[in-house]
Amino acid sequence: MRLVVCLVFLASFALVCQGYSSGYTRPLPKPSRPIFIRPIGCDVCYGIPSSTARLCCFRYGDCCHRG
């Protein structure tokens, strides 16, 4: 009995990992825009040089206001 429960659990876990759910499968949607990994300086704007803030604003659309 334990073996059956273990096998069912492993099979369901494998299906979830592959992206299947409740018998109906569909492709995962792609993001509408590319995902960029931002440098830490863009998120923490305090104490960064103004050239770095300008670069962040130009490249990632993340305008930093120094303060």
UniProtKB/Swiss-Prot annotation:
Keywords recorded for this protein, A-Z: Amidation, Antibiotic, Antimicrobial, Chitin-binding, Disulfide bond, Fungicide, Signal
Molecular-function GO terms, alphabetical: chitin binding
Post-translational modification Arginine amide, affected residues: R66
Superkingdom field: Eukaryota
Pfam families the record matches: Penaeidin
Annotated InterPro entries: Penaeidin (IPR009226)
Family: Belongs to the penaeidin family.
Annotated protein name in UniProt: Penaeidin-4c
The organism of origin for this protein: Penaeus vannamei
